[in-house]
A protein has these predicted regions:
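Cleavable N-terminal signal peptides
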Residues: 7-8, 18
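Positively charged n-region of N-terminal signal peptides that target proteins for export
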Residues: 1-4
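Mature soluble binding/inhibitory domains
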Residues: 21-259
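Generic detector of short alpha-helix boundary/capping microenvironments
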Residues: 8-9, 109
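N-terminal signal peptide c-region/cleavage motif recognized by signal peptidases
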Residues: 13-17
Length: 259
């Protein structure tokens, strides 16, 4: 893996794309095709590179090890993120023997392109003359439980509002209470005594969650969609879009830490 990592490092050093993947959707996850259970791809996303590990089968129907080093190329007109790069086949010593890295062999067998939205992707790759095209989604085997009390910042931009003064970006320090189940989410935000209630469904897609529903605040009601809900022991982050009876377009981000 050291030589693979060296190849990856050379891509990073000379890549023209120098942003951190915090500015894009984090694609790190286990990806699969639900109707083809038995194979899959693990994506590890660092900065502008997605390292892909394939668990697939060779012509002898035995497990075969491939890796792909896909660097960011562009964003498609439909919003998809496009990553592409070389694909390698590796072989090495049997696990029952002391590992000798000098026995590892690496051969480039083709290229791979990973075109991803938040929770779905297309995968195109070739192994020598064999070309494969697959549709993928993040694989979910457990759902996060967001239930708890939090404090943080809610940043929202409103547009198309009936009152011009409401067309603005506002950053609010909020207290947040969330109740979450496998299929439902309720969230209450408290900004200096101004209470807003969000009630909707909940869907887990790999490490990402999402929710759609309705919200009500003093003088405002509407619909919302929360995307890229990520949770860890410290807190929760996510993106939100929606509309209300006052503004036709709302977008923003939520970042909250556990109390």
């Amino acid at each position: 893996m050291k030589r693979i990592a060296a190849c990856l490092l050379s891509l990073c050093l000379f890549s023209p794309f120098a942003f951190a993947n915090t500015f894009t959707t984090d694609l790190t996850d286990l990806w699969w095709n639900e109707s083809e259970s038995g194979w899959g791809v693990t994506a590890t996303h660092q900065r502008e590179v997605v390292f892909l590990t394939f668990f697939v089968y060779g012509v002898d129907s035995r497990a075969t090890f491939y890796t792909g080093q896909a660097s960011y190329v562009s964003q498609a007109s439909n919003g998809a993120l496009i990553f592409s790069g070389p694909m390698y086949e590796t072989a090495g010593p049997w696990i029952g023997l002391p590992f000798n890295p000098n026995l590892v062999t690496i051969r480039q067998v083709g290229t791979v392109t990973f075109t991803a939205f938040v929770d779905s992707a297309t995968l195109t790759y070739n192994v020598d003359s064999t070309v494969v095209n697959k549709s993928l989604t993040r694989q979910t085997f457990r759902s996060n439980d967001l239930t708890g009390g939090y404090a943080g910042v809610f940043r929202q931009t409103s547009a198309g509002c009936s009152t011009p003064a409401s067309n603005a970006t506002v950053e609010s320090v909020v207290g947040v209470a969330i109740t979450n189940s496998l299929t439902a989410l309720t969230m209450t935000t408290n900004e200096s005594g101004t209470i807003c209630d969000y009630v909707g469904n909940y869907r887990q897609s790999g490490r990402m969650g999402s929710s759609t529903g309705t919200f009500s605040c003093p003088g405002r009601t509407g619909t919302y969609e929360m995307l890229e809900i990520e949770a860890n022991p410290s807190g929760v982050t996510g993106r939100i879009t929606g509309r209300s009876n006052v503004c036709s377009q709302i977008s923003g981000r939520l970042a909250i830490v556990k109390r």
